[in-house]
Amino acid sequence: MGGNNQKMIDILEKVQQSESEVGLRNAACRSLFFVHPHKTAKVCLFLHGFTAGPYQFEPLGKTLFNQGYNVLVPLQPGHGLAGDWNQHNPPPLPTDIKAYLEFVLKWVKIAKTLGEQVVVGGLSSGGTLAAWLALQYPQEIDRALLFTPYLGNQNLLFDLLIKTLPIYFEWFNKDASGNFGYKGFRVPALKIFLELGEQVLKEAQNHPSAPILMVCSESDRAVSRSKQQNFFTAVVKQQPKSWYYCFDDSLEIEHRMMTKLEDNDYEELVITLAKAFIGTDLTWRQFQDIAINIVQGEAYEKIQQEFNLDPQTSQYLSAMMTPHFGCDNLKCINPQGVGVNSKH
């Protein structure tokens, strides 16, 4: 394996070298690779959000690398490039979804050489791509982590505008902390993800999927939470090893939920969910039962054993099921948004 692994590390180094040659708008946009000198049991492939960059997965990537996984966070096509981009000279983002689909398939192939099982994950449009992989290749993908995937806009009017207006759009939060990506884009570049979101939502109704973790937030005003809930409800019927968690509004976790740098003061909670989901094979029913046991006062040490987790992760996960984190009556793990009955 040593030779193969070295060959792959050389390929990853070439990717970063070519990024340096073409010129990136910020060092934070560079592809991130956290790779051990050997093949690991699982390899994680993470896909950043639209107009953003790999920096969104640095905290989670480092954590999972330290847990013994290989981690790949490649820069997506047309993203992160240096240039004076504006409405007269928009960034060169693809307007054909094939560019992204071919890209993710290429990286799944690379990932397979670095781990026995491939875990995929993504934020926003990256989550949409991860959902597509989970549905199209359920035999090849071990599981998919969907962090507030873009399956539609919260405001239906935006869906309509994105489908019809070929305009340049600037992000409302373009100068927000941690925004190292593009400040704007031409709408057709986003339209292709809206269409992909509609496709995966439709396919989930009668198509088996790899296990998925759906993470959403009540404070996310960008994307449709009801569509995320519908997607999860459809998937879990055929894939019982899927989980759902929605952060309460009181935590103020917005759409860019992966890092403290991007205004999520609770980044460790996102990391906790990811670690727990990747490390166990519990079904949705078992996950709910454990949550009910937490509410009924079961010690986190017992949770630690059942989930096969380190003490800190067990403590966080236990706390996340309580009203202290806004999870009244376990509504945070109910895709219908109401409390879960805590009586067996």
Each language-model region and where it sits:
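Short, surface-exposed "cap/lid" segments of acyl-processing enzymes
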Residues: 25-79
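Short alpha-helix in the alpha/beta-hydrolase fold that links the catalytic acid
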Residues: 60, 210, 224-235, 244
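Catalytic histidine neighborhood in serine/cysteine hydrolases
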Residues: 72, 235-257
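Conserved acidic catalytic loop of the alpha/beta-hydrolase fold
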Residues: 101-118
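Short glycine-enriched nucleophile-adjacent loop
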Residues: 127-138, 144-145
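Active-site nucleophile loop of the alpha/beta-hydrolase fold
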Residues: 145-156
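Short beta-strand/loop motif that positions the catalytic acidic residue
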Residues: 208, 214-220
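Catalytic active-site module of serine/aspartate enzymes centered on a nucleophile-bearing elbow/loop
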Residues: 253-344
